[in-house]
Swiss-Prot record:
Gene3D superfamilies to which the protein is assigned, alphabetical: Spore Coat Polysaccharide Biosynthesis Protein SpsA, Chain A
One Gene Ontology biological process: capsule polysaccharide biosynthetic process
UniProt cofactor note: Binds 1 Mg(2+) ion per subunit.
Catalytic activity: dTTP + alpha-D-glucose 1-phosphate + H(+) = dTDP-alpha-D-glucose + diphosphate
Protein name from the UniProt record: Glucose-1-phosphate thymidylyltransferase
Organism: Streptococcus mutans serotype c (strain ATCC 700610 / UA159)
Domain of life: Bacteria
Any Pfam family: NTP_transferase
Stated family: Belongs to the glucose-1-phosphate thymidylyltransferase family.
Length: 289
């Protein structure tokens, strides 16, 4: 399976911060925002990842993450000249996807919770169909909303409905089989002129091929698209790291624990940083601090 991070958009909700840098390069406590969705794909066992962003921002992502080899992964990059909808990612990434299945994650979404890696790897291992994730919210009219029957089977999905049929939002993380490329090519732009991811999910639902996994109590899904939610996410990450004495979205740690890099490689990455807490954390990880 391959992965795509959609890190485009104009960032108008975070203006004027986004005059200085892409939204997905903003700090969320102690790491760039892009680290969080990248860590999610790595935890799913995905090592071949395409980052899609605007022509003006893409060089900054390349400078930050380069080819991904220091984390034992392969990173590629592609331009999205204009924000024409989330489903456009599969058209832009068609050649990258090839004959593989693909996961898409939005560049401003953060996930954290017990058993997250197992849940992600289960979704990534499915042979066919699509898997998305439902999360209970107080303001479902802001999201794509999924309706369930009494057996927790998805029966409808609506994009930002005026009268939501449930409080379960579809989060910004999606796993698809290879037919997603053809589906994306054949959906029509919505009234706002975008290729909606909800229409992709509806296509899978109509053919009986959509699985919705509910993120239960204990999971956190953070959408960092506003000033308030960006601050809340930073405070959440700080609290988790301080209370649990661990790092969230530490790419070197995840790469090591997933077997993508060795202890020697971690040591090499940590040495230039050994005078700060980040480097000390990496050295403790391999038992050398």
């Amino acid at each position: 399976m391959k992965g795509i991070i959609l890190a485009g958009g104009s960032g108008t909700r975070l203006y004027p911060l986004t005059r200085a840098a892409s939204k997905q390069l903003m700090p969320v406590y102690d790491k760039p925002m892009i680290y969080y969705p990248l860590s999610t794909l790595m935890l799913a066992g995905i090592k071949d990842i395409l980052i899609i962003s605007t022509p003006q921002d893409l060089p900054r992502f390349k400078e930050l993450l380069q080819d991904g080899s220091e984390f034992g992964i392969k990173l590629s990059y592609a331009e999205q000249p204009s924000p024409d909808g989330l489903a456009q990612a599969f058209i832009i990434g068609e050649e990258f996807i090839g004959d593989d299945h693909v996961a898409l994650i939005l560049g401003d979404n953060i996930y954290y919770g017990p058993g997250l890696s197992r849940m992600l790897q289960k979704a990534a291992s499915k042979e066919s169909g699509a898997t998305v994730f439902g999360y209970q919210v107080k303001d479902p009219e802001r999201f794509g909303v999924v309706e369930f029957d009494n057996d927790r089977n998805a029966i409808s999905i609506e994009e930002k409905p005026e009268h939501p049929k449930s409080h379960y939002a579809v989060t910004g993380l999606y796993f698809y089989d290879n037919s997603v490329v053809d589906i994306a090519k054949n959906i029509k732009p919505s009234p706002r002129g975008e290729l909606e991811i909800t229409d992709v999910n509806k296509a899978y639902l109509d053919r009986g091929d959509l699985s919705v996994e509910v993120m239960e109590r204990g999971f956190a899904w953070l959408d960092t698209g506003t000033h308030e939610s960006l601050l809340e996410a930073a405070q959440y990450i700080e609290t988790v790291q301080r209370m649990q004495n661990l790092q969230v979205a530490n790419l070197e740690e995840i790469a090591y624990r997933m077997g993508y890099i060795t202890a020697d490689q971690v040591r090499e990455l940590a040495q230039p940083l050994k005078k700060n807490e980040y480097g000390q954390y990496l050295l403790r990880l391999i038992g050398e601090a």
